[in-house]
Design a protein with these regions (language model features):
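ABC-fold ATPase nucleotide-binding domain signature/coupling loops
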Residues: 49
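ATP-binding N-terminal substructure of ATP-dependent carboxylate-amine bond-forming enzymes
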Residues: 23, 65-67, 103
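Short loop/helix-cap segments at secondary-structure boundaries that form the rim of catalytic
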Residues: 36-44, 127-132
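N-terminal metal-binding scaffold of metallo-dependent hydrolase/deaminase domains
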Residues: 1-41
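Active-site loop-helix segments enriched in His/Asp/Glu that coordinate
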Residues: 91-139
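Histidine-centered catalytic micro-motifs
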Residues: 54-66
Length: 139
């Protein structure tokens, strides 16, 4: 079995305290095999000057509205916000909306988001959800 070891100044495990000069061992499929404090041989260890932490979760998303980023007037209250969504929802062609959904999936994953809960009112995000490396749930 091929093993990959990466290390950083700190490793933040899912449970437990941060580990100074910690490491994470992975198998060839990316499954975590072991986490611990780095001691001894480090020649085959990939070191990163920073921290390693579990993937982040976006627990409330409306990915289908990605095309509306930076389009809302501020300080309109909840009813004003909802009115803007209703007015702008179909303001871009479907192909553009789907491309922007994929762009936002790629951006979130690149920034460390590995799981997402999406509140969806249409099927425009379904193809991107099938292709993403992120774990997704749709409500």
């Amino acid at each position: 079995m091929t093993k990959r070891r990466i290390s950083a100044n700190y490793v933040f495990p899912v449970t437990g305290e941060p580990i100074k000069n910690g490491y994470v061992d992975f198998d060839e499929n990316g499954k975590i095999l072991e986490i611990g404090a780095l001691e001894g041989e480090t020649e085959s260890t990939e070191f990163y000057n920073g921290i390693l932490c579990p993937g982040f979760t976006n627990a409330h998303c409306h990915i289908e509205l990605s095309h509306l980023k930076d389009k809302f007037q501020e300080k309109t209250g909840m009813s004003g916000f909802i009115n803007q969504i209703n007015a702008l929802r179909d303001s871009a062609p479907k192909e553009e909306r789907i491309a922007l959904i994929q762009e936002q999936f790629d951006r979130m994953y690149a920034e460390g988001v590995t799981a997402m809960a999406d509140i969806s009112n249409c099927d425009e995000s379904f193809d991107a959800k099938c292709r993403t490396k992120m774990y997704t749930r749709t409500f």
